Amino acid sequence: VSIIPTGGAGGYTMPLPERDEMYNTKGKMLQDITVDLGGRVAEELIFGDITTGASQDIKQATALARAMVTQYGMSEKFVLMGLESRESMYLDNGSVLNCSDETASHVDEEVMRILKEAYEEAKRLLTENRECLDQISAFLIEKETITGKEFMEIFHKVRDEANEYHQEELIFAE
């Protein structure tokens, strides 16, 4: 993760693949959407307001949620339906929904449902881990970039401190 502005972006997150995956699972895609929306949630939690900074993340989350619904049959409403097809590469290789206007409206509703659920999950996770969020934010303000290893070190340190605090709380309660 970097907060150094590059190429018109205010910062950049590049997840490294944990292993070679030819196919993504529904669960993994939902996690990716949740991560994509984490920046917007963090803005709300920290600043009490939102900015344009998460626009690319929102675009990416929306595209992934839409693909889950229209291409991969990974939604509750359209389980076994492929609703989207790719146009010829001579026509900009765009995609076309192969459904009625009413079904397209339901697709939009399903995409919004997926995004809202992922947003609420990101909010829950960041609220529960607020101390970690604050420490990682402070690290980024100082260093401008954080590696996955540095991120996990901070995460485990905060978790260990929280566990120690709760252990002491239990001892004093007895």
Where are these regions (language model features)?
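Soluble catalytic regions of large protease machineries
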Residues: V1-E174
